[in-house]
């Protein structure tokens, strides 16, 4: 499909009489494959085998060492089992946050957390405020963008700059 081949596909779950991808993919040999999730037995094994990138979920209240850092160790072990270079997989995380009544303290905590994520090997972070989505929260995020870009510069990771 990504090569412009429209030959029929007959699979166990899907039958495609004329698979068509229009417009054709720009990236060669195919678009980057990102697999999201943190299942340790299947999902991270599939990441190690097939993906160009993964997106993990930063579960609120789970310490970094038991959460994201642990998932990255599991991914590394799957890469070793597959004979895959762990470093060639981009690691992303989706992190939900709430600034709380003390916005300044909430911002400090968020910046520190993103710095910690970069330090354990996260390349990209998607930060999502928990509702309500208001202009003040978004403006507060904008106010720390220079600091987040500085994390990227120091670590080589874009974890905090997304």
Task: Show which residues each predicted segment covers.
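Active-site-adjacent structural elements that line small-molecule/cofactor binding pockets in enzymes
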Residues: 1-162
């Amino acid at each position: 499909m990504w090569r412009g081949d429209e030959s029929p596909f007959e699979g166990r779950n899907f039958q495609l009489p004329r698979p068509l991808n229009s417009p054709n993919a720009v990236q060669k040999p195919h678009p980057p494959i990102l697999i999201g999730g943190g299942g340790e037995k299947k999902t991270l094994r599939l990441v190690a085998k097939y993906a160009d990138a993964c997106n993990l979920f930063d579960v609120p209240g789970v310490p970094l060492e038991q959460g994201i850092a642990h998932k990255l160790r599991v991914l590394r072990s799957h890469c070793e089992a597959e004979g895959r270079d762990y470093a060639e997989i981009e690691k992303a995380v989706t992190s939900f946050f709430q600034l709380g009544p003390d916005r300044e303290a909430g911002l400090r905590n968020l910046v520190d957390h993103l710095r910690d994520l970069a330090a354990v090997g996260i390349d990209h972070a998607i930060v999502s405020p928990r509702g309500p989505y208001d202009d003040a929260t978004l403006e507060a995020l904008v106010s720390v963008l220079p600091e987040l870009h500085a994390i990227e510069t120091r670590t080589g990771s874009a974890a905090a700059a997304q």
